[in-house]
């Protein structure tokens, strides 16, 4: 079949994941894992921690970038509280709280190993529930002020990269705050010395409850044969952590859009994948997922409906010279 090479690759991968020669992606869901991060006490975030709760509430009202897109495209949105810094119940949000916020990684571990495992297993369970609900593609998003800092720390720990190479400005920082952010990450890594061969230990030491649950969600997608859509920086770091735990999970990942965070490229290279879209978004939340769902649907439509040359009554002898070249092939 003649088609966009990437759409062709997507449809082939979807066929392998679903076991269907002509896969269909209809029911899609964005799963948002939300938690606060104690490292914000170091003054490395432009927004106060209260924004986490406010944005989670706005998600349930379709008032954030991600939820507005999801609502427009007819996608489901499920938000789970993994560790928002509040005791109040949040209508429309699943209560899966492991603890209120995490520890300040510059001074103490983010959480205990048992708490990291609890968050990871919760994410796996939420992905399994999505599969049971008939979801055919699950996007993994997040909400948590300070989570670009924890993501950079986790990525640095997993890849031996210096903080300078994986740390961006997140939601926006002054030059002074940006330098402090890198120093805080360096200090956290020096304090905890997380072992890259122990991804759960890395999450417990310098990660976040949102990251741990997202990691579990990616593992749960693989376990239940559900295509998993990766959003931006935080999401791709969680995806890489999942792959470090279970390399086969990488076969279920579909990278949506490229993040402007400097560490995104490192994580993508570690996964051996390229993002599909360059949208210039700095929203997080899972905002790239609803758009990527449409790309996957398009790939399925091409596989299902596009004719081969013989089916279209087109003679393809003229392609012989092109096919003879190693640098360019056209697949009938």
Describe every region a protein language model picked out:
Residues 24-90:
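Active-site cofactor/substrate anionic-group-binding motifs, chiefly glycine-
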Residues 47-53, 153-165, 245-251, 298-301:
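A glycine- and small-aliphatic-rich helix-loop capping segment at beta-alpha/alpha-beta transitions
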Residues 40-41, 140, 145-152, 211-215, ...:
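Short glycine/serine/threonine-rich phosphate/pyrophosphate-binding segments
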Residues 1-5:
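Short, small-residue-biased leader/transition segments that mark boundaries at the very start
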Residues 138, 149-213:
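Phosphate/pyrophosphate-binding betaalpha-module
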Residues 216-255, 274-282:
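Hydrophobic alpha-helical bundle architecture
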Residues 261-314, 323:
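Internal helix-turn-beta structural module
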Residues 99-148, 152-162, 170-177:
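Glycine-rich, mobile lid/loop segments that gate access to catalytic sites or pores
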């Amino acid at each position: 079949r003649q088609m966009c090479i990437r759409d062709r690759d997507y449809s082939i991968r979807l066929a392998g994941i679903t076991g269907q020669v002509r896969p269909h992606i209809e029911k899609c869901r964005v799963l948002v894992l939300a938690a606060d991060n104690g490292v914000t006490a170091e003054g490395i975030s432009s927004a106060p921690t209260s924004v986490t709760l406010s944005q989670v509430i706005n998600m349930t009202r379709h008032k954030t970038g991600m939820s507005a897109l999801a609502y427009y495209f007819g996608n489901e949105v499920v938000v789970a509280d993994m560790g928002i810094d509040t005791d109040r119940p949040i209508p429309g949000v699943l209560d899966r709280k492991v603890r209120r916020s995490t520890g300040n990684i510059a001074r103490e571990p983010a959480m205990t190993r048992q708490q990291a495992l609890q968050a990871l297993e919760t994410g796996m369970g939420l992905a399994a529930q999505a599969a049971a609900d008939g979801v055919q593609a699950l996007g993994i998003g997040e909400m948590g002020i300070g989570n670009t800092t924890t993501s950079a720390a986790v990525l640095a720990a997993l890849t031996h990269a210096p903080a300078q190479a994986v740390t961006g400005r997140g939601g926006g920082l002054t030059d002074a705050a940006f330098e402090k952010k890198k120093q805080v990450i360096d200090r956290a890594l020096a304090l905890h010395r997380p072992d890259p061969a122990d991804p759960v230990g890395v999450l417990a030491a310098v990660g976040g409850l949102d990251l741990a649950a997202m990691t579990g969600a990616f593992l749960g997608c693989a376990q239940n044969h559900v295509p998993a859509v990766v959003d931006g920086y935080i999401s791709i770091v969680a995806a890489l952590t999942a792959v470090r735990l279970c390399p086969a999970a990488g076969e279920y990942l579909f990278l949506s859009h490229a993040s402007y965070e400097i560490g995104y490229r490192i994580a993508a290279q570690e996964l051996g994948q390229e993002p599909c879209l360059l949208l210039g978004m700095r929203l997080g939340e899972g905002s790239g997922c609803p758009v990527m769902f449409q790309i996957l649907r398009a790939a399925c439509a091409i596989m299902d409906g596009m004719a081969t040359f013989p089916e279209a009554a087109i003679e393809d002898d003229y392609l012989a010279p092109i096919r003879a070249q190693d640098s360019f092939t056209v697949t009938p």
